[in-house]
């Protein structure tokens, strides 16, 4: 019988296509410092399904028992009773308020000397896990800022009437949306580490296969999980091994220089593009169980890291992916295209 307990989530290993989205998610799990991923694409293309499937695939974490912040007991001076739980996968509803997201300070309890002085929000629940925001492009800009700040710093600070409470909020931020419903402001979009684009699969035979697999899974989920259990375990093992080996991955100075040359060639503002492109290439190298970044690692990841950072010119006839590919060929392959 399958060791993956949540039979309501489609197995990650069984998801057909959408390789760009799957790669971006896996690399962020390997190195959360990449900075999250924005997934833009058509409705009904498996965005939510894939994110839930990945969270279910990952190994359990150890926390202090019944702790609302999912605190890691390692390294603490005091010993606590612990429990193993699935990695948190928290979905943020579109109409959420700042109090619902960040938590609330109970002034009456504080003045009365009580213990329940803080009501944790969604950021507390997401600590050491994944925070998913569907239709993030429709979310209030201020709330998006709050999420990005917490994801980058690893902390959530709540202040009210001169009282401040701070707690860990280390999570991978995943946003998704349909570009037809509007884009995020460039200033916010730039703060996401990666940007994956997905499209509806057009090949009829592949569409039929996807439909059949989904219907079969809904009918007999246990059989389906048993069928893919070995592949699930292999992916899980590769991710865990990559996390352990990430610190030992090397990238040559020449490759680092060329990554920066591409960013300069594309007139990308700031250094986030350089940093994330390097981190993503190293994460992919670790995932492939190698010790040194190759040209292919950079080629597979650089578009994910840079496409949302390009200046938008409505008069251009090529898309962002093609533009990055041309810059890659020019600088890495010495092509005069």
Give the predicted meaning of each segment.
Residues 222-277:
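Conserved AAA+ ATPase small/helical "lid" subdomain
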Residues 46-49, 260-272, 283-337:
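C-terminal engagement/docking regions of AAA+ P-loop ATPases
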Residues 23, 145, 186, 190, ...:
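Non-catalytic, well-ordered alpha-helical scaffold segments
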Residues 34, 156, 216, 287, ...:
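Conserved hydrophobic residue
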Residues 100-103, 184-242:
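Conserved AAA+ ATPase core "coupling" helix
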Residues 2-205:
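Conserved ASCE/P-loop NTPase catalytic core
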Residues 18, 204, 252-253, 269-275, ...:
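Alpha-helix N-cap/helix-initiation sites
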Residues 22-31, 275-286:
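Contiguous, well-ordered alpha-helical segments that form the cores/surfaces of helical PPI scaffolds
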